[in-house]
């Protein structure tokens, strides 16, 4: 996005007396694919074919009579670019998209999605009010937040559809816990508020383990049934949903009316489900190649010492681009289809890799930081081990800090 465009967006927001709710998300027209590879220091390659394959694979698994799908596209479609992927969701006939920010809602609508937009987290009052044009279905899990949303709806002479989040599975994040006596009273009070219309009941599983999911599922069945009966809700107008990616693959009892797959749509799935393809690759190019003698140290704090005369390739990205410092002296990248080690500490804008054992490495050569090159692959499990966290902890940031190129 051009600096002038961003400045104009911020000024308009200030003039309107509104804060910018989330980072601006560019539309596909802003992605100049022909220029990305040669002009950017690093980029993401997004495989639309793989994304559409994953959607169809899931649809085939669920069957025509199975639950509906709500494609979770929060965090800018897990860093993949919601503007790039929404057209595929529309083409596949997916009836619901789950998002977090109003920016994601705006982009989804502008890209032609006319179905249900469900926010998958609690929202601030300002967010709720600013989301009214997008016909958002909000999430509520407390009487206080429900009252706030109802007040906004009444002020604007409208009704806001809401999903009631239950803490049945023990996430203790958004949901109301009906095992507490006063919470049952609060839940019933929510249903009586003018300005909000219950359209869903949901819970979220905190652990990817079958028995834990089944335990939370049993409580959710009790809680949702109590709420339907005590609240005298019309079951035909309520969408009950609980299954995340793990439960969608492993626990069919959690399907109910709708499933909420996130990671699996992008190929971030249980390793044994190899039919789901990775959608993202993270790439850069060699900026320069330098020759250094044995005994030299590399990078800040001298954390790596060369054991031989070495050729080091300078890669023009660092932790400001989402390549974590935790990967220093542990990770590897792919050049010429071969694994080469990261040496020295990751800098703000630079990492160094040892290419001594390769021939003819030169500026402009493609480097794969995550993904495949020839028969070699930078594996998810390896990066997660080096980083000490889920890969999503990194790739969602990659998406915000690097341009995207559609793989043709």
From Swiss-Prot:
Disulfide bond annotation, renumbered to this chain: 70-96
Top enzyme class: isomerase
Top-level taxon of origin: Bacteria
Segment forming the signal sequence: 1-21
Reactions mediated catalytically: an L-alpha-amino acid = a D-alpha-amino acid; L-lysine = D-lysine; L-arginine = D-arginine; L-alanine = D-alanine
Binding site residues for substrate: 173, 348
Positions of the catalytic residues: 74, 300
Subcellular location: Periplasm
Residues with PTM N6-(pyridoxal phosphate)lysine: 74
GO molecular function: alanine racemase activity; arginine racemase activity; lysine racemase activity; methionine racemase activity; pyridoxal phosphate binding; serine racemase activity
SUPFAM superfamilies: Alanine racemase C-terminal domain-like, PLP-binding barrel
GO cellular component: cytosol; periplasmic space
E.C. code: 5.1.1.10
Assembly, per entry: Homodimer.
Family designation: Belongs to the alanine racemase family. Bsr subfamily.
Function noted in UniProt: Amino-acid racemase able to utilize a broad range of substrates. Reversibly racemizes ten of the 19 natural chiral amino acids known, including both non-beta-branched aliphatic amino acids (Ala, Leu, Met, Ser, Cys, Gln and Asn) and positively charged amino acids (His, Lys and Arg). Is not active on negatively charged (Glu and Asp) or aromatic (Tyr, Trp and Phe) amino acids and displays minimal activity towards beta-branched aliphatic (Ile, Val and Thr) substrates.
Family matches, as HAMAP family: Bsr_racemase
Name of the protein this chain belongs to: Broad specificity amino-acid racemase
Organism: Aeromonas hydrophila subsp. hydrophila (strain ATCC 7966 / DSM 30187 / BCRC 13018 / CCUG 14551 / JCM 1027 / KCTC 2358 / NCIMB 9240 / NCTC 8049)
Gene responsible for this protein: bsr
């Amino acid at each position: 996005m051009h600096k002038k465009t961003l400045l104009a967006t911020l000024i308009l927001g200030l003039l309107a007396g509104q804060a910018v709710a989330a980072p601006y998300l560019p539309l596909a027209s802003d992605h100049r694919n022909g220029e990305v590879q040669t002009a950017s220091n690093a980029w993401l390659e997004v495989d639309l074919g793989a994304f559409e394959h994953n959607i169809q694979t899931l649809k085939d698994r669920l069957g025509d009579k199975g639950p509906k799908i709500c494609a979770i596209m929060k965090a800018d479609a897990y860093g993949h670019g919601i503007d790039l992927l929404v057209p595929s969701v529309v083409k596949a006939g997916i009836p619901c998209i789950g998002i977090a920010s109003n920016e994601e809602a705006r982009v989804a609508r502008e890209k032609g999605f006319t179905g249900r937009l469900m926010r998958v987290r609690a929202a601030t009052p300002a967010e709720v009010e600013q989301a009214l044009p997008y016909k958002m279905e909000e999430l509520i899990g407390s009487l206080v937040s429900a009252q706030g949303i109802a007040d906004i709806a009444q002020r604007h002479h409208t009704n806001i559809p809401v999903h009631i989040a239950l803490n049945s599975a023990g996430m203790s994040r958004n949901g109301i816990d009906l095992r507490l006596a006063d919470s049952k009273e609060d839940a019933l009070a929510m249903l009586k508020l003018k300005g909000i219309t219950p359209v869903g009941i949901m819970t979220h599983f905190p652990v990817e383990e079958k028995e834990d999911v089944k335990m939370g599922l049993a409580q959710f069945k009790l809680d949702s049934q109590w709420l339907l009966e005590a609240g005298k809700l019309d079951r035909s107008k309520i969408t009950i949903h609980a299954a995340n990616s793990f439960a969608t693959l492993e626990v069919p009892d959690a399907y109910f009316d709708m499933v909420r797959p996130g990671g699996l749509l992008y190929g971030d799935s249980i390793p044994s489900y190899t039919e789901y393809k990775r959608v993202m690759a993270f790439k850069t190019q060699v900026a320069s190649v330098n020759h250094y003698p044995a005994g030299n140290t590399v990078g800040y704090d001298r954390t790596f010492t060369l054991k031989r005369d070495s050729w080091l390739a300078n890669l023009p990205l660092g932790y400001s681009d989402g390549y974590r410092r935790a990967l220093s002296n542990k990770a590897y990248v792919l050049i010429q289809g071969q694994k080469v080690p990261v040496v020295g500490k990751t800098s703000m804008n630079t990492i160094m890799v040892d290419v001594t054992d390769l021939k003819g490495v030169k500026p402009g050569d493609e480097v794969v930081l995550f993904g495949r090159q020839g028969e070699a692959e930078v594996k998810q499990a390896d990066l997660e081990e080096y980083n000490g966290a889920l890969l999503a902890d990194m790739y969602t940031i990659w998406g915000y800090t690097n341009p995207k190129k559609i793989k043709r």
